[in-house]
Regions:
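Glycine/serine-rich anion-binding loops at beta->alpha junctions
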Residues: 59-75, 155-172, 376-394
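C-terminal nucleotide
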Residues: 1-63, 88, 92-124, 220-381, ...
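Phosphate-handling active-site elements
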Residues: 140-148, 175-192, 397-410
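Glycine- and acidic-rich phosphate- and metal-coordinating loops
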Residues: 135-157
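A short glycine/serine-rich beta->alpha loop
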Residues: 53-54, 70-77, 116-124, 154-162, ...
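Structural signature of FAD isoalloxazine-binding scaffolds in flavoprotein oxidoreductases
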Residues: 76-96, 215
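Beta-strand segments within the central parallel beta-sheet cores of soluble alpha/beta enzyme folds
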Residues: 100-102, 147-154, 183-195, 334-339, ...
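Fold-level recognition of mixed alpha/beta catalytic cores in primary-metabolism enzymes, strongest
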Residues: 160-248, 430
């Protein structure tokens, strides 16, 4: 383990380039950018926590949802891929029992006293609640947790649908796992992070985001037993055929004030399930749902009914997407992507917020994508929780320059990311 100044010099000299290539690819320009980014993070760590500390550097990726929009929390299927946009954390353990985290772009220094357990008043929806909840998750797993100081620099857009929260959570979990030798498996870390987000942060998320950031690659998950989900890793290299790029567009809206909208999707799906005597839609047969349709409309309302239909269709579609990827049939996969996008509009109804119809960035981005890509081998859909944030598009090389240019003309410079997928999950880099 090196001190921060030594490590900064080594990174700048290229000593750790092989580690960076494993995460970010071989492009020389990207490796130079990551060297500078890591060195800047080390400098900021020294600024806030002092020079000469023995440090380690961790990385946790964001994720692109490939299929299974709002199915995981109903014990259905999920399909997602880790991406090269990530959170980097420089960390050093301490002996005073406090966790201190400074995140780039945020003025506040989070300070958590680990002797104070349980959710704290006024802390929910703030990053401190996630840290406290993750600490509790480690304790519940029988692991002793100590203090650490960390500086984080995230390229995962906040409120963008690339799951910045999961990247932050997994970064914190990776630090504890690494600094204190806890030895927990990636899936166990993911469940701890989901617990923290649900119980301490107060957002009813599923598990797929955390699993993808923890494990890396393309993850197919069956959440029939959410405590022990069945996981299948599909290597990321098999997704895109030659000449096809995955673009993610930040429409410059934010998920940050939309927790109630997200929660309503889960609540309405579970309202349908409860009427049919079950807890979640994954426990309901589709035939029983259709048989009860008249009564469900009256008791639960049409939006809840439509969202339940979305669940059944999207769940079947996600399984078909997995099969298409495993068979190397990108055309079949792309057709299913388009179907998923249409379902978000018509059934799940999470492309825009019904109380703010003036702002429909996702709708505009999808319409623009259709105008450029229709008739090609590409595809487009909304991703993530919805209502604001990002869309994704699979863009053939012949249209990539035009697509990128048009998207950034409408949504601003730097809004369109051409992503690589990442095989590694949350890891200690150095």
């Amino acid at each position: 383990m090196a001190n921060s100044a030594q490590l900064r010099n080594e990174i700048a000299a290229g000593k750790w380039d092989d580690k960076l290539r494993a995460l970010y690819g071989d492009a020389a320009q990207e490796i130079c950018r990551q060297r500078a980014r890591y060195c800047a993070a080390l400098e900021q760590f020294e600024l806030y926590f002092g020079p000469g500390r023995q440090v380690q550097v961790y990385s946790a990726p964001g994720r692109a949802e490939l299929g299974g929009n709002h199915t995981d929390h109903q014990h259905g299927y999920g399909l997602a891929a880790a991406v090269t946009l990530d959170l980097v954390a420089v960390a050093a353990h301490n002996t005073d029992g406090y966790v201190r985290v400074k995140s780039r772009g945020f003025n506040k220094l989070d300070v958590i006293d680990l002797t104070v357990e349980g959710p704290q008043e006024g802390e929910s929806t703030h990053s401190a609640s996630l840290i406290r909840g993750i600490a509790e998750g480690f304790r519940a797993a029988g692991k002793a947790v100590g203090g650490f100081d960390a500086y984080t620099a995230s390229d995962v857009l906040r409120g963008s649908g690339l799951s910045s929260s999961a990247a932050f959570e997994m970064g914190m979990a990776a630090i504890w796992n690494g600094e204190y030798g806890c030895g927990l498996a990636p899936a166990e870390l993911a469940k701890i992070c989901q617990y923290a987000e649900n119980t301490y942060f107060g957002k009813p998320s599923g598990l797929l985001d955390q699993l993808t950031s923890a494990v890396g690659g393309i993850i197919f998950a069956d959440f029939a037993d959410p405590q022990q989900p069945f996981l299948e890793k599909i290597h990321a290299d098999g997704l895109l055929p030659p000449g096809m790029s995955l673009c993610v567009t930040d429409t410059r809206g934010s998920h940050s004030e939309l927790t109630g909208e997200f929660a309503a999707i889960r609540q309405e799906m579970e309202l349908i399930a409860a009427f049919l005597g079950k807890k979640v839609l994954g426990q309901v047969t589709e035939s029983a749902f259709w048989a009860a349709l008249p009564a469900l409309r009256k008791a639960c309302g049409d939006r809840a009914v439509l969202r339940a239909i979305h669940y059944f269709e999207e769940n079947a579609r996600t399984l078909a997407q997995r099969d298409a990827l495993q068979a190397g049939q990108f055309d079949a996969f792309a057709a299913l992507v388009l179907e998923s996008g249409r379902a978000s509009f018509a059934l799940c109804q999470n492309v825009y917020c019904s109380t703010d119809v003036r702002h429909q960035g996702l709708s505009v981005a999808l319409a623009l994508s259709q105008s450029i890509l229709q008739g090609s081998t590409g595809a487009w859909r909304m991703q993530g929780g919805g209502f604001a944030g990002t869309i994704q598009a699979y863009v053939p090389q012949s249209l990539l320059e035009r697509y990128h240019s048009e998207i950034e003309r409408v949504f601003g410079k730097g809004s369109c990311y051409i992503l690589r997928l990442r095989e590694q999950g949350a890891v200690k880099v150095i």
